[in-house]
C-alpha cells in the first residue's frame, strides 16, 4: 500500500517553496542569518537572476527514455552532480543539523562538505554514512590550527579538503546587524520576540540553544563556551594569507585539495600551476564582497583558464535542476548547494534535506529528457546560449 506524502512534502515542490516554508518556520533573525548577503545584496540576487539569462536549446529527437545523472569526482562515484556545500551553524536550524544533512547526502549517494563553523566536530560527522565527506578550512593566523584541522580530517577519513579563500575578512551583513544577530547568537529584543512567535522551532530547539558552539574550535578539556570559542574563531581570520600558505597546505594534505572562492581566471591558472586539485567558482553566496559577479557569469572564463586540467565546480544561486544542467553545459563538473540544505533542515530535518536533494534529481532528469540528453557527459556548450556570457544567438 502506497502512503500519501506528508503535507509539508506536497507543499515543498520547489526550492523556492522550501525557502518560503523555512521563512515561515524560523525566527526572522535565524532565517536572515542564512538568507542574507552583504550590504545591498546585489551579488546575492545576481547569483540567481544570472541563470535566467542562460537559455537551453533542446534536441528532442535524440531519444532519451533513460537518464543517467551519475558522475565520478576525485575517484568517487556520486549519484548526481549536486553536493551539499558548507554552511556554519546548521545546528541552529534543526537539532544536530550537520549530521542530519550528512546522513541525507549519504542516503542520496552524494557528497557532503562540513563547514569549519559547524556545531558538530570533524570526528562526529565522520560517523554519518559512507558517502564522500569533504572538510572546509581557512588559512588562520595560527597556521598550526590550519594544520591541526587538516590532520584531524585526514585521521577521520575525509576525502577532500576545501580551502575557502574569500573569507579573510567578515562581510558586512546588514540583515544580521538590523536583527541584532551576532556570533555567538544574540537576537536583540525584536529577535527574542520573533523567537517566541515560532513555537514549534522554539520547542524543538529548547535543549539545543544553550549548547550551540563551534565544535571544531573547542580545545580538549575546555568548556564549550560559545563566546570564548567564537571570539577565538573571529580572531583567527587572516587578511595576510597568500599563495605561500596555499603551498604549505598542499604539503600537509595529500588528498584532493580544492580552492573555494575563485572568480578570477588568473587565480585559477595559478592554482592549477601550484598543484591544486579542483576549483569552486564562488562568491560566498553573496555574503562577502557585494559587487562581485555572479558565479555562473564567470564560470566560462574559469573553465577556459583551467583547460580541463582539474575539475571546476560552482556554487551560488543554484535553485533548480535546470541551473545545474546549465552550469554543467558551461563546463562545471558539479554544483554545490548550501542555503537549500538549511531550508530543508528548518522544515523537516534529515527528511527535509533528503527531499531537497530529490527535487534537484527529479528536475535535472526532467530537463535533460526534454533537451534530449541521456548522460552528464553529453552536456556541452551547444546546449546553451546567452547574451551575457558569450553573445551567441540560437
Which stretches of residues belong to each language-model region?
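Short beta->alpha linker loops
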Residues: 38-39, 116-120, 141, 263, ...
Amino acid at each position: 500500500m502506497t502512503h500519501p506524502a506528508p503535507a509539508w512534502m506536497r507543499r515543498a515542490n520547489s526550492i523556492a517553496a522550501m525557502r518560503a516554508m523555512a521563512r515561515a518556520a524560523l525566527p526572522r533573525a535565524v532565517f536572515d542569518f542564512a538568507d542574507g548577503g552583504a550590504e545591498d545584496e546585489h551579488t546575492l540576487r545576481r547569483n540567481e537572476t544570472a541563470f535566467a539569462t542562460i537559455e537551453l536549446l533542446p534536441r528532442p529527437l535524440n531519444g532519451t527514455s533513460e537518464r543517467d545523472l551519475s558522475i565520478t569526482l576525485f575517484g568517487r562515484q556520486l549519484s548526481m552532480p549536486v553536493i551539499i556545500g558548507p554552511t556554519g551553524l546548521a545546528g541552529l536550524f534543526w537539532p544536530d543539523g550537520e549530521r542530519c544533512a550528512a546522513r541525507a547526502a549519504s542516503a542520496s549517494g552524494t557528497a557532503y562538505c562540513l563547514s569549519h563553523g559547524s556545531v558538530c566536530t570533524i570526528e562526529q560527522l565522520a560517523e554519518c554514512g559512507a558517502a564522500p565527506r569533504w572538510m572546509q578550512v581557512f588559512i588562520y593566523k595560527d597556521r598550526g590550527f590550519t594544520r591541526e584541522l587538516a590532520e584531524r580530517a585526514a585521521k577521520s577519513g575525509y576525502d577532500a579538503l576545501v580551502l575557502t579563500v574569500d573569507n579573510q575578512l567578515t562581510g558586512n551583513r546588514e540583515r544580521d546587524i538590523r536583527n541584532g544577530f551576532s556570533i555567538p547568537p544574540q537576537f536583540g529584543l525584536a529577535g527574542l520576540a520573533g523567537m517566541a512567535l515560532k513555537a514549534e522551532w522554539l520547542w524543538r530547539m529548547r535543549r539545543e540553544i544553550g549548547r550551540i558552539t563551534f565544535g571544531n574550535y573547542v580545545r580538549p578539556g575546555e568548556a564549550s563556551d560559545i563566546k570564548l570559542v567564537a571570539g577565538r574563531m573571529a580572531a583567527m581570520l587572516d587578511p595576510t594569507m597568500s599563495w605561500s600558505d596555499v603551498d604549505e597546505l598542499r604539503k600537509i594534505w595529500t588528498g584532493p585539495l580544492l580552492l573555494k572562492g575563485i572568480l578570477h581566471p588568473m587565480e585559477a591558472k595559478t592554482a592549477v600551476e601550484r598543484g591544486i586539485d579542483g576549483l569552486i567558482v564562488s562568491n560566498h553566496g553573496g555574503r562577502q564582497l557585494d559587487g562581485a559577479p555572479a558565479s555562473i557569469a564567470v564560470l566560462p572564463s574559469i573553465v577556459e583558464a583551467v583547460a580541463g586540467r582539474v575539475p571546476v565546480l560552482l556554487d551560488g544561486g543554484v535553485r533548480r535542476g535546470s541551473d545545474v544542467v546549465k552550469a554543467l553545459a558551461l563546463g562545471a563538473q558539479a554544483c554545490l548547494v548550501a542555503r537549500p540544505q538549511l531550508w530543508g533542515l528548518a522544515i523537516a530535518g534529515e527528511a527535509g534535506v533528503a527531499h531537497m536533494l530529490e527535487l534537484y534529481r527529479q528536475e535535472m532528469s526532467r530537463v535533460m529528457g526534454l533537451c534530449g540528453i541521456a548522460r552528464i557527459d553529453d552536456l556541452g556548450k551547444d546546449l546553451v546560449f546567452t547574451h551575457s556570457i558569450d553573445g551567441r544567438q540560437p
